[in-house]
Amino acid sequence: MRMSTSTEVIAHHWAFAIFLIIAIGLCCLMLVGGWYLGGRARARSKNTPFESGIDSVGSARLRLSAKFYLVAMFFVIFDVEALYLYAWSTSIRESGWVGFVEAAIFILVLLAGLVYLVRIGALDWTPARSRRTLVNPETDSPTNRHMQ
């Protein structure tokens, strides 16, 4: 087996090398061009939002509940799970029973995580103070309360 020299490697991959040089050059050109051609004005009116000729009133920031971020994180976690399971399902013939057992363990670990999230109340949308407590109808009925 013959070792390839660096000139043979370059000769084989010259088109990709030129592509990389041009791509990096264009990125640098756009960054430098934006810096040179961009505006330099720093005034009070430049930093205020403007829409349809109407000055803004109040703050443009919206405060979102942290629950929306939790839902987004859960979506990403379970979306990545689906991605791994899709990759596993396309190669199920090559992985055989070992791959099946590994996928089952993966699903069980994720289900255990989901059960944990449900048990700590991470998926509850109602505030803690407005949650209803479970009432045993035999011992804590309205008629039993009057008798005590």
UniProtKB/Swiss-Prot annotation:
Membrane-spanning segments: 14-34, 68-88, 98-118
GO MF annotation, one: NADH dehydrogenase (ubiquinone) activity
Signal peptide annotation: none
Intrachain disulfide bonds: none
Topological category with respect to the lipid bilayer: Multi-pass membrane protein
Keywords associated with the record: Cell inner membrane, Cell membrane, Membrane, NAD, Quinone, Translocase, Transmembrane, Transmembrane helix, Transport, Ubiquinone
EC number: 7.1.1.-
Catalyzed reactions: a quinone + NADH + 5 H(+)(in) = a quinol + NAD(+) + 4 H(+)(out)
Catalytic class of the enzyme: translocase
InterPro entries the record matches: NAD(P)H_OxRDtase_bac/plastid, NADH_UbQ/plastoQ_OxRdtase_su3, NDAH_ubi_oxred_su3_sf
Pfam families: Oxidored_q4
Compartment(s) where it occurs, according to its Swiss-Prot or TrEMBL record: Cell inner membrane
Main subcellular location: membrane
A single cellular component GO annotation: plasma membrane
Stored Gene3D superfamilies: NADH:ubiquinone/plastoquinone oxidoreductase, chain 3
Family membership noted in the UniProt record: Belongs to the complex I subunit 3 family.
Function description: NDH-1 shuttles electrons from NADH, via FMN and iron-sulfur (Fe-S) centers, to quinones in the respiratory chain. The immediate electron acceptor for the enzyme in this species is believed to be ubiquinone. Couples the redox reaction to proton translocation (for every two electrons transferred, four hydrogen ions are translocated across the cytoplasmic membrane), and thus conserves the redox energy in a proton gradient.
Subunit structure: NDH-1 is composed of 13 different subunits. Subunits NuoA, H, J, K, L, M, N constitute the membrane sector of the complex.
Name of the featured protein: NADH-quinone oxidoreductase subunit A
Source species of the chain: Klebsiella pneumoniae subsp. pneumoniae (strain ATCC 700721 / MGH 78578)
Gene name tied to this protein: nuoA
